[in-house]
Amino acid sequence: MIKGTRYTNGTEVITFSKIDFIVIGGRKIDHVYFRRKNKVDLIMPLVEWNLKGKFEWLITN
């Protein structure tokens, strides 16, 4: 994934920011961070993004 890549689900546009981990129950789980226009980040587990997100959010570049 390239920083700055934009995706949309038809109602809003999100911009890929970074991949980082969050510790949940002693396990490091990779999460994907996206910027939104309203300045509230969208944070989604990488596994969930790979399974579902890429199909729901189409690349708009």
Question: PLM ranges: what are they?
Answer:
Residues 17-46:
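Basic/aromatic-rich interaction segments and small domains that mediate binding to polyanionic partners
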Residues 1, 30-31, 52:
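Coiled-coil-like amphipathic alpha-helices with heptad-repeat character
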Residues 39-61:
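Intrinsically disordered, low-complexity, charged/polar segments
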